[in-house]
From Swiss-Prot:
This is Probable WRKY transcription factor 38. Residues 104-172 bind DNA. The gene is WRKY38. Belongs to the WRKY group III family. Residues 249-266 have a biased composition (Low complexity). GO terms for molecular function: DNA-binding transcription factor activity; transcription cis-regulatory region binding. Its main location: nucleus. It comes from Arabidopsis thaliana (Mouse-ear cress). Gene3D superfamilies: WRKY domain.
């Protein structure tokens, strides 16, 4: 297919819009990163213009058969250079024709296609090497698409990606690359969760429930100890009240020991002694054991 045909021009415009959309996506995912030479508004405007140009090209009146025949005749009439086969000249012409290029503040790792690096070399008057890539399906499907990547500016950083030719491999072969390009590694990391099933899930719920119960009981014990300390301070001069507190603390369940027939002091103790003075009732009623 002729590189300057309307169809190829439309493809170039769509690819450029796709590149701008990917850059805008990265900027929206990382708003604090360096904005680069183009603002978000400029990127959005470029996306709209590229798709508008593609639609305009595809909607234009196609060439007539006479125009196509005339174009083919003019190309065929030019003699090939000596010592160079026509097939080799056709491949070289395709490879030397710059399809389109993209300058971005970050390297374009995912552009919707799978690439394989086959070379790298230093460039004159440049501090950064240039990397060379070809389509991963170059041998399997005879896809001649290639690209070059190089950092052309340091401050602010600018990476130039130059594409040559167009992909002739099937679209479904690049679904993995498109799927990866549509995801953000940070989003994948944030969305990672562990799912538990069966006994593991029941054990996790039981562990959380037991931990909560122990925490509540610990808080109740602290409050109870604080109340007893305050009660001791108030009743420090009342020996009978002190004896009641000691009996309460020495009981296994935190309650008063039961009466016994042995005639112990706890059985003979008269609880009315605690309230022989009505003026002190307010002091005792504020404590609950």
């Amino acid at each position: 297919m002729e590189m300057n045909s309307p169809h190829e021009k439309a493809v170039q415009a769509i690819r450029y819009g796709h590149s701008c959309a990917m850059r805008l996506k990265r900027r929206l995912n990382h708003p604090m990163a360096d904005g680069g030479p183009l603002s978000s508004y400029d990127l959005a405007k470029s996306i709209v213009e590229s798709f508008s140009n593609a639609i305009s090209i595809l909607s234009a009146k196609p060439e007539t058969e006479d125009d196509q025949f005339s174009d083919l005749s003019s190309r065929d009439s030019s003699p090939p250079p000596q010592g160079s086969p026509s097939k080799k000249r056709k491949i070289d012409s395709t490879n030397s024709s710059e399809n389109w290029r993209d300058d971005s503040p970050d390297p374009i790792y995912y552009d919707g296609y799978l690439w394989r690096k086959y070379g790298q070399k230093s460039i004159k008057k440049s501090n950064h090497q240039r990397s060379y890539y070809r389509c991963s399906y170059n041998k399997d499907h005879n896809c001649e698409a290639r690209k070059h990547e190089q950092k052309i500016k340091d401050n602010p950083p600018v990476y130039r990606t130059t594409y040559f030719g167009h992909h002739t491999c099937k679209t479904e072969h690049n679904l993995d690359a498109i799927f990866i390009a549509g995801q953000d590694p940070l989003d994948d990391f944030k969305s990672t969760q562990m799912i538990r099933f069966g006994k593991d899930q029941d054990q996790e719920k039981e562990s959380r429930s037991n931990g909560f119960s122990l925490s509540v009981k610990h808080e109740e014990d602290i409050i109870k100890e604080q109340a007893i300390d305050q009660y001791r301070e108030i009743t420090s001069n009342d020996q009978d009240c002190q004896d009641v507190i000691e009996e309460y603390l020495s009981s296994p369940s935190g309650s008063y020991p039961p009466s016994s027939s042995s005639g112990s002091e706890s059985a003979d103790f008269n609880s009315d002694l605690l309230f022989d003075n009505p003026d002190s009732w307010d002091r005792y009623d504020q404590f609950y054991f």
